[in-house]
UniProtKB/Swiss-Prot annotation:
It is found in: Cytoplasm. S-adenosyl-L-methionine binds at residues 35-37, 55, 84, 105, 112. It catalyses: cytidine(1402) in 16S rRNA + S-adenosyl-L-methionine = N(4)-methylcytidine(1402) in 16S rRNA + S-adenosyl-L-homocysteine + H(+). GO terms for biological process: rRNA base methylation. This is Ribosomal RNA small subunit methyltransferase H. GO terms for cellular component: cytoplasm. It comes from Chloroflexus aggregans (strain MD-66 / DSM 9485). Belongs to the methyltransferase superfamily. RsmH family. Specifically methylates the N4 position of cytidine in position 1402 (C1402) of 16S rRNA. It is an enzyme of class 2 (transferase).
């Protein structure tokens, strides 16, 4: 039975063009999600292509296995539960070194956002969780109910780029004195009272929820740790492809690629001087592609 893991992968054609899969090539999808990119890469790498798929969410791996099995490609993929911060260890244990391409599709899947029980969304009430890996670490409720007012304000400002961070943190602390936060709708309502109505299409809780998700999953730290490992695992000529969804991620990727392309012994050449965006047609059918930015670099030594 196929797991209900609904996720539309972004920029599939652009990813395949960037990775340029070849028959017999070996690839790593460090954020395999529902397997949409993995399927396209393996189809382009026939015959003989192999892929290592990694994801922190066990449900994503089940969905990917089902998707690849339906296409007759399951035996060409190794699927591992884990964090891409441990990329080198996972790749070493599975024999995926000197690979031809590595993909990072950052952010949260449609399934995670649209499943209230995962606690990522302010649009539907659910437990205040937000863990990409539901078996690991503190939840968003843990952070909201235990961090000091200053720590909360710092998280919301730094990771959410929310200018009302101090006022939001103050309101959270005042409210939790009498009743701890447990539900997403409860937190969203408190934020909305502080910030006010929608900012155009943006819900007033958007930036705070993003900040908490990043903090819960240590997303930026793990990305910064994973990128050097990825370069080390690439064979000369191998491609590093990264899709980011907000400025904090994109800044880390941009600065990393630039640093690796400069200096006395550069290891990368940058293929995308400016990030590639989704086409208007794709955004029309998949609005979550609107903020996607794709960057590509090639290993040269």
């Amino acid at each position: 039975m196929v797991v209900t893991f609904q996720h539309v992968p972004v920029m599939v054609a652009e990813v395949v063009a960037a990775l340029a899969p070849r028959p017999g090539g070996r690839y790593i999808d460090a954020t395999v999600g529902g397997g949409g990119h993995a399927l396209a890469v393996l189809q382009a790498a026939r015959p003989g292509g192999r892929l290592l798929g990694i994801d922190a969410d066990p449900a994503a791996l089940v969905a990917t296995a089902d998707r690849l099995a339906e296409a007759g490609l399951r035996e060409h993929a190794v699927l591992c539960h884990g964090s891409f911060a441990d990329l080198a260890v996972i790749a070493g244990e599975t024999g995926f070194i000197n690979v031809d391409g590595i993909l990072f599709d950052l952010g949260v899947s449609s399934y995670q956002l649209d499943t209230p029980e995962r606690g990522f969304s302010f649009a539907a009430d659910g437990p205040l969780d937000m863990r990409l890996d539901p078996t690991q670490g503190p939840t968003a409720a843990d952070l909201v109910n235990t961090l000091s007012e200053r720590e909360l304000a710092d998280v919301i400002f730094q990771y959410g780029e929310e200018h009302a961070a101090r006022r939001i943190a103050r309101a959270i602390v005042e409210r939790r004195r009498t009743q701890p936060f447990q539900r997403t709708a409860d937190l969203a309502a408190v934020i909305a009272r502080v910030v006010g109505g929608r900012r155009g299409r943006i819900h007033p809780a958007t930036r705070t929820f993003q900040a908490l998700r990043i903090a819960v999953n240590r997303e930026l730290d793990r990305l910064a740790a994973a990128l050097p490992q990825a370069v080390h695992l690439l064979a000369p000529g191998g491609r590093l492809v990264v899709i980011s969804f907000h400025s904090l991620e994109d800044r880390i990727v941009k600065q990393f690629m630039r640093a690796e392309a400069e200096g006395a012994t550069p290891r990368l050449v940058i293929n995308t001087k400016k990030p590639v965006a989704a086409t208007d047609d794709e955004v029309a059918t998949n609005p979550r592609a609107r903020s996607a930015k794709l960057r590509v670099a090639t290993r040269i030594v």
